Amino acid sequence: MPKGIIGKKIGMTRVFKDGKAIPVTVIQVEPNYVVNIRTEDKDGYSAVVLGTGEKKEKRTPKPMLAIFKKAGLKPLRHLAEFPLKEGEQPEPGQEVKVEDVFEKGDLVDVTGTSKGRGFASAMKRWDFSGFKKSHGSRYHRAVGSIGACSDPGRVWKTKRMAGHYGNETITVQGLEVVDIIPEKNIILVKGSVPGAPKSVVKLKESVIIHRRKGKRKLERAKAVYAS
């Protein structure tokens, strides 16, 4: 089975456990289908390509249309590639459900596109403190100095200034799976994830479980949901 799955962010709510309120993000996992399999012999690595969401056939490129037809699937809108777990390998055209990939207490990394905020000031974009609000200050929300005078005589690249903010791919690591509702294809993840409601997100096995702190966090989470 793959180490990840494609879902859709619904919104945030909270659940109660032992009298404590836990903020969670509700993610709906629509039917995911295996589109293609990457193999060591052909591609040099092992992975699986999952797809979800309907797409019109006339809007699908012919090379992709051939891949879908080979797997016995209709064109799918969203595709993502995930590494494979050890054990049973999926077949092209097979449906992958959320309970096949994750269980309570797992740690996941969630990738999504952050909300676009348009042209934003340096204070909003980079969390600058700004100038004094009173006592004769000539500036309040200005950037301030953006470089030296004659040397180098220009503004350095990557200088933090006003500009386009948001609409970026962001990954939040080490979020805990609080609950899975198979009959509704819903997974509850502790904390917030990037993106607006109804935006597509990718959930995959967290990379921090291979670190010392991540292993301890995973052990604590598993112990909580085992009790």
From Swiss-Prot:
Q: Which cysteines are joined by disulfide bonds?
A: none
Quaternary organization: Part of the 50S ribosomal subunit. Forms a cluster with proteins L14 and L19.
Q: Which UniProt keywords apply?
A: Ribonucleoprotein, Ribosomal protein, RNA-binding, rRNA-binding
Q: Is Ribosomal protein a UniProt keyword of this protein?
A: yes
Ligase: is it a keyword of this entry?
no
Any one Pfam family here would be Ribosomal_L3
Q: Which PANTHER family match?
A: 50S RIBOSOMAL PROTEIN L3, LARGE RIBOSOMAL SUBUNIT PROTEIN UL3C
Q: Which Gene3D superfamilies match?
A: 3.30.160.810, Translation factors
Might you report a single GO cellular component term?
A: cytosolic large ribosomal subunit
**The species this protein was found in:** Persephonella marina (strain DSM 14350 / EX-H1)
Q: Which family does it belong to?
A: Belongs to the universal ribosomal protein uL3 family.
GO biological process, alphabetically ordered: translation
Its annotated function is as follows: One of the primary rRNA binding proteins, it binds directly near the 3'-end of the 23S rRNA, where it nucleates assembly of the 50S subunit.
Q: How is this protein named in the record?
A: Large ribosomal subunit protein uL3
Cross-referenced InterPro entries, in alphabetical order?
Ribosomal_uL3, Ribosomal_uL3_bac/org-type, Transl_B-barrel_sf
Please provide, alphabetically and separated by semicolons, the GO molecular function terms listed in this UniProt record: rRNA binding; structural constituent of ribosome
Superkingdom assignment:
Bacteria
